[in-house]
Curated annotation (Swiss-Prot):
Superkingdom assignment: Archaea
Family listed: Belongs to the UPF0146 family.
Protein's name according to its UniProt entry: UPF0146 protein PF0123
Disulfide bonds: none
Transmembrane domains' residue ranges: none
HAMAP family noted in UniProt: UPF0146
The organism's taxonomic lineage, starting at the top: Archaea, Methanobacteriati, Methanobacteriota, Thermococci, Thermococcales
Pfam families on file: UPF0146
Alphabetized InterPro entries for the sequence: NAD(P)-bd_dom_sf, SAM-dependent_MTases_sf, UPF0146
């Protein structure tokens, strides 16, 4: 999954905020992006997941992507999500459009993303991308 961090590094200017939505307890990509020099924030509806990220020195917010607090996302340069539930994908795309930033989704096998997203293969991982 660290290949996703490499892809974001190649595509997104390094002076910005990158937001992972639906982080859960998997922090490897967020940590790798921090190593690359990005300002990273994670978001999850699960308060325990956010507490875990903060404990690992990654800032986080509890937020619901279906009713997002746009203040969290306004300074973002990109949003990404790893294996989100299919019903969340459209909400992520709507959010990315509102704040006008690229969206990167690594799906579970067989999940169908919104039609507007383009499938790319980067170092063996499938990534759906939407760019404004």
């Amino acid at each position: 999954m660290e290949a996703l961090a490499e892809l974001i590094k190649r595509k997104v200017p390094n002076e910005g905020l990158i937001i992972e939505v639906g982080v859960g307890f998997y922090l490897k990509v967020a940590k790798k992006l921090k190593e690359y020099g990005f300002n990273v924030v994670v978001v999850d509806i699960n308060q325990e997941a956010v507490k875990n990220a903060i404990k690992e020195r990654i800032p986080g917010f509890v937020d619901d992507v279906f009713n997002p607090n746009l203040k969290i996302y306004l300074k973002a340069r990109a949003i990404y999500s790893i294996r989100p539930n299919p019903e969340i994908m459209m909400a992520l795309l709507t959010l990315a459009k509102k704040v006008k930033v690229p969206l990167y989704i690594v799906p579970l096998s067989g999940d169908v993303p919104p039609r507007e997203m383009k499938l790319i293969n980067y170092k063996g991982i499938s990534v759906y991308v939407w760019e404004p």
